[in-house]
Structure formats: C-alpha cells, structure tokens
Amino acid sequence: QSFDKALRHFSDISIEYMVADLDVRTAVYSKGYDAVCAFVNSVIDADVLKILYDNGIRLVLMRCAGFNNVDVNEADRLGITVMRVPGYSPEAVAELAMGLALATQRRIHKAYIKVRENNFSLHGLTGVTLHGKTAGIVGTGKIGAAMCRICRGFGMKVIAYDKYHNESLDFVEYVELDRLLSESDLISLHCPLDDTTYHLIDERTIEMMKNGVILVNTSRGAIVNTDALIKGIRDMKF
C-alpha cells in the first residue's frame, strides 16, 4: 500500500508484486522489467545476478538496510547497481529491542500466559531493576545510537563496542567487546551481518557473559550461533 501511495507522484513507473522471494528459481520472472525490489529473505548470489543480468536487469533495490544477502562484488562486475534503505525508523527498532528486554526482565510474557489461564500467582514473576545496571550496545549506528539513548533514559550505564565511534554519544564509554560481554547486564546487538560478525555470539562469548544476562538481537539472526544460544539457555546463563 505504501508503494502504491508513492506511485501517485511517479506516473512513469509501474510496479508488479510477487509473493515469492527472489532466488534462483524465481529470478527468471524478471524478464521484461527494468529493476527488481527484494527484501532480507531473498538470495541474490552470483547465479541469481547472472539470470537478472541476462534478463536486462541493471538495478537491484533492497527495501532494507542490510545487504548481506547480495553478492555486491558480482553485481559490480556485471554492472548492476545495488541500492538500499540506509536507515528507516531507527527509533522503532530500538524501542522494540527495549520492549523485548523489558518483557524478559519483568517476565511480562510469563505473567500474560498465567493471567490468561486464570492463574494469579506471583511465583516466578519477580524481575530486576534496570536502573543502575550496565547496558552493552554492540553497534552504534542509527539504531544502536537510539538504543543507547533509551538505556540512558532508564538510568543505565551505557558502554558500547563499534569499530567506528559515534561522536554524538558523549555519554557512552566505548570498550573492547570482551569487556562489554563480561560487564553488561543487558546486551543488545545492532551490527550488520558480515564475515566478522557471523556467529559473533557463540559458546565462547556466551561463557564470558554474566549469569542472568539479558541478550537481545534485532539484527540478523546469524550473528548469534543458535546451538550455542540453546546451550546457554539450558545452562541457565540467561
């Protein structure tokens, strides 16, 4: 609907919608079009790009900030331009991240299930106070910076890890990743997925965390090793 609304101002552009994600099986349907628009679950590797190129596609539009699912080197070699949305509603994502943290920390989801089943026992619903605790933010781009400001509003000490320091966050202390993992009561991930962040959270890094730590990931799922996460849950780390 948002696309259709925007199209009212561009009479020379038409859009056709497909339910299926873009991959090697569906790329053939691009014939006759000038561009394709994809999302986070699309697989735009070298094989897909070759099909797109042969069909006359010279523009790939990603309606998301991340582009880890696009072989940008192959796209560049073929002369296909790849564009993305560098930032959209960073506060909304950061608020969701804090909402998830609060649901965990205050056992809101458990309380909801109990009340729905007419169980008003308070057993197992005791939470902890975030005020005065340490929030560790991994990645301080637009979303991570918004999360830093939210955590500050809760009266938390905010530390962060990022290759590039955000100069606007003068209240944030940048530290090495190992220190962040070991000192934080809340760890929130806001980094892109690439070769350096794939399984950034694994068995070794989980072992470094405090017992009872709150871990929130609103970035790409592959930043966290799922098997290691399950083991950490079973070991009562979280």
Task: Give residue spans per PLM region.
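Rossmann-like adenosine-cofactor binding region
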Residues: 163-238
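Hydrophobic Val/Ile/Leu positions in short beta-strands of Rossmann-like dinucleotide-binding domains
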Residues: 38, 135-137
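Glycine-rich Rossmann-fold phosphate-binding loop(s) that bind the pyrophosphate
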Residues: 140-141
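An N-terminal-biased, well-structured beta-alpha scaffold segment characteristic
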Residues: 1-81, 202
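A short helix->loop->beta-strand "cap" motif at the edges of active sites that frequently abuts
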Residues: 54-59, 78-80, 156, 211-213, ...
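Phosphate-binding beta-alpha-beta segment of Rossmann-like dinucleotide-binding domains, i.e.
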Residues: 78-134, 146-149, 153, 161
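Gly/Ala-rich phosphate-binding loop of Rossmann-like dinucleotide-binding domains
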Residues: 53, 148, 152, 233
